[in-house]
Amino acid sequence: MRKTLLAASALALAVAAPFASAYQAGDIIVRAGAITVDPNESSSDINVGAATLAGEKANLDSDTQLGLNFAYMVTDKVGIELLAATPFKHNVGMKGATVNSLVPSGKLGTLKHLPPTLSAVYYPMDSNSAFQPYVGLGINYTWFFDDELSSDAEAAGFRGLDMKDSWGLAGQVGMDYMLTDNIMVNAQVRYIDIETTGTTYLGTSKVTVDVDVDPWVYMVGLGYKF
């Protein structure tokens, strides 16, 4: 009986050993995977000069890129995390009778952006658990660049396109599942507050529109703990 108990205890320790310490203060975690920015946008009416085109709106499509996370554990349960990614590219569309009569395709142009986000992250589970859910809150800076008009928009007389950079809050929930003491599967969802103003010109008239991009950001990948 004693031998049976010892054998059972040894087996339990052997199984638990890989997860004896999921995270500890000082750990560095690197994650990589597919990340999708899915805009949940709403826009003001498009303004042309002093006129407002009622009901004429702007919109953005989604894009998927390589996402990267770098985290440092300040304590066993609290970490600081930086979100990075390869540049996202979105089509900028317009909808409404007036703008679509000018640009029938509805495509104003394209833009690229990088949304680095710095967050404080909390892991509520005990460190010996293989399953490590977490929540985070942080600040985002979105840098828009390579804003370009479509050929249809240029043919209609539009010139230049500029999107204003944005600061905003970001919240997230996620989970790691430890496959080994160092390797994990990760899934996470974020909501990021991104507000921007798009500016272009139609002839000599300035065209502007305010857009609350406010995307949901999804990422699935693998991670490694150093």
Give the positions of each predicted feature.
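Cleavable N-terminal export/targeting peptides
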Residues: M1-G26
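Short glycine/proline- and aromatic-enriched beta-strand/turn motifs that initiate or cap beta-hairpins
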Residues: S21-N69, G223-K225
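Gram-negative (and chloroplast) outer-membrane scaffold detector with strong preference
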Residues: D27, N69-S150, V213-F226
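Transmembrane beta-barrel architecture of outer-membrane proteins
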Residues: T36-D38, S62-L66, T86, K112-L114, ...
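Outer-membrane beta-barrel translocator domains and adjoining extracellular loop/strand segments
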Residues: S42-A50, N91-S101, F145-A156, T197-K206
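Short, conserved structural micro-motifs that define repeat-unit consensus positions
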Residues: G67-A71, M184-N186
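Predominantly the C-terminal beta-signal and adjacent terminal strand-loop region
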Residues: K89-G93, T180-F226
